[in-house]
Design a protein with these regions (language model features):
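Structured beta-strand/loop patches that form or line metal/cofactor-binding pockets in enzymes
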Residues: 1-27, 31
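A generic structural signal for short
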Residues: 4, 77-78, 119-121
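Solvent-exposed alpha-helices and their adjacent loops that cap or buttress functional pockets
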Residues: 7-10, 106-108, 136
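Short secondary-structure boundary/capping elements
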Residues: 10, 100, 123-127
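Broad gene-expression machinery/nucleic-acid interaction feature
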Residues: 13-15, 83, 111-113
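Metal- or metallocofactor-binding catalytic centers and their adjacent structured scaffolds
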Residues: 19-95
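N-terminal small/glycine-rich loop or linker at the start of catalytic domains
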Residues: 22, 71, 95-120
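Metal-dependent enolase-superfamily TIM-barrel catalytic cores that perform enediolate-based chemistry
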Residues: 110-136
Length: 136
C-alpha cells in the first residue's frame, strides 16, 4: 500500500533496558530510525542517564533533551530520550508495585478498541492481512 509518505514493509525499533542500583530494570522503546536512535543512545544519552534518579523522570528527560540542542530536540533525539523515559516509568511502576497507567492518572476506560493508524504497509493487501494475523 502506498501512503502520502510512500510505502514501507519493515520497521525497526530500538529496545532499551535501564538497570537501577537497587536491581530493578525497566524496558523502553524508541521508534524511528533505529540506527540513529541507537547511536544517540550509545554515544550520548546513556552516559547522561547513568547515576540519575529514575523517579525524577521529567528532570532526566530534560537533561537528555538539553544534550540535543544542535538537533533541535526533534526526530531521532526525541525517540532516544523517549526510550529511556519509558524505561524509567516501567522502573517506577515496578518499584511502587503499581501499573504505569496509575502513575499517569489512572484507569479511564476498562476496554479500548484496538486500531492501527500507521501499520506496516505492504503493496499487496493480502500480504497486509497475513502480517496483521501474525502480530495479533
Amino acid at each position: 500500500m502506498q501512503i502520502s509518505r510512500g510505502g514501507f514493509a519493515i520497521r525497526n525499533h530500538t529496545l532499551v533496558r535501564v538497570h537501577t542500583d537497587s536491581g530493578i530494570s525497566g524496558l523502553g522503546e524508541g521508534i524511528g530510525n533505529a540506527l540513529l536512535v541507537k547511536a544517540i543512545l550509545k554515544e550520548q544519552m546513556c552516559e547522561l542517564a547513568v547515576g540519575q534518579d529514575p523517579f525524577n523522570i521529567e528532570a532526566l528527560r530534560q537533561r537528555l533533551l538539553d544534550s540535543q540542542v544542535y538537533f533541535e530536540r526533534q526526530g531521532s533525539a526525541i525517540c532516544a530520550a523517549s526510550a529511556i523515559e519509558m524505561a524509567c516509568w516501567d522502573i517506577k511502576g515496578k518499584a511502587l508495585g503499581v501499573p504505569v497507567y496509575q502513575l499517569l492518572g489512572g484507569l479511564v476506560q476498562k476496554r479500548l478498541e484496538a486500531y492501527a493508524s500507521d501499520v506496516y504497509w505492504q503493496k499487496d493487501p493480502s500480504d497486509m492481512a497475513k502480517e496483521a494475523l501474525r502480530v495479533v
